[in-house]
């Protein structure tokens, strides 16, 4: 069966969904065959690591019987969002393995893609909120009160989940399954009702979900870095640096990883829009955009499994929390004993 690139599985009306010359640009059959065979395995691996990693992060944050600080509230919500997201990846992997033949019905077609779309918004809005909180702590420390920030963080997270869900409604409503008799498949497609929806979609996807948040992230983190440079001399006098500096270093790493993982997706999504409105044409652009979108999707998926790794390797305070949780959950009989206590036990054992 010939490959059917995703660009041709998305259109503004039924007559344009499967053009007669659709196979004229099938210039990369080997690349598509390799993608169908290899990419699902990588996606399942991401799902496994993301599921275990984000569950672990949530357990570390939520099991101890104490209130979360502001940064932990945001990071726990980010882990929860990633966890919900990776649960939908096996369906995506099976879809690619079947060469875009969707076997799960219309409801799951809408639900899975709606979850993916909601995660896109929730994740980047949480990154903005985290950056804004660090900005307030480091740049305007006198204006931020801990109790007020904690309450604000909870409200902000609830609003982000609600807004992310609302922004995913168009995807939920416009996704549908469509039979393709020529290829003997049933595809899960985004069926746009009018040409104007292409513009609305790119405004939502590239501007609302990336460029505007990116501008806010750059603004906040530029001032954060400037503030950290100003405190460099003070930090050198402290052993290991301040707690705020450690938390900020972790968050900056998360921000950079998020942008690296998601920027290619938005780049190819914009190229897809240009192709849809025929600003760019030709078989080269079609194959380049189709294959690029699949690889960019994969790179974006990795962000959900990469965050727990960043917590472990870049988050010194997170590692401390893991150790505290381990000591809390380990029975006292299994806890490590001091050398002096061990010596006393040894002497008592051999004493007659």
Curated annotation (Swiss-Prot):
The record ties this protein, via InterPro entries, to: Brdyknn_1_rcpt, Brdyknn_rcpt, CCR1-9-like, GPCR_Rhodpsn, GPCR_Rhodpsn_7TM
Membrane-side (Cytoplasmic) residue stretches:
63-72, 132-153, 228-250, 316-352
Q: Name one GO biological process term.
A: response to mechanical stimulus
Q: Report TM segments.
A: 42-62, 73-93, 111-131, 154-174, 207-227, 251-271, 295-315
Disulfide pairs? 109-188
Carbohydrate attachment residues: 13, 21, 184
- Where is it chiefly localized? membrane
Q: How does it sit in the membrane?
A: Multi-pass membrane protein
Question: Does the UniProt entry include the keyword Lipoprotein?
Answer: yes
Q: Where in the cell is it found?
A: Cell membrane
The alphabetized UniProt keywords are: Cell membrane, Disulfide bond, G-protein coupled receptor, Glycoprotein, Lipoprotein, Membrane, Palmitate, Receptor, Transducer, Transmembrane, Transmembrane helix
- Output the Gene Ontology terms for molecular function: bradykinin receptor activity; C-C chemokine binding; C-C chemokine receptor activity
Please indicate the ranges of residues that lie on the Extracellular side: 1-41, 94-110, 175-206, 272-294
Sorted alphabetically, the Gene Ontology cellular component annotations on this record are: external side of plasma membrane
Superkingdom of origin: Eukaryota
Q: Where is lipid attached as S-palmitoyl cysteine?
A: 329
**PROSITE patterns noted in UniProt:** G_PROTEIN_RECEP_F1_2
Function, as annotated, reads:
This is a receptor for bradykinin. Could be a factor in chronic pain and inflammation.
**Which family would the database say this protein is a member of?**
Belongs to the G-protein coupled receptor 1 family. Bradykinin receptor subfamily. BDKRB1 sub-subfamily.
Q: What is this protein called?
A: B1 bradykinin receptor
Record organism = Macaca fascicularis
Please name the gene that encodes this protein: BDKRB1
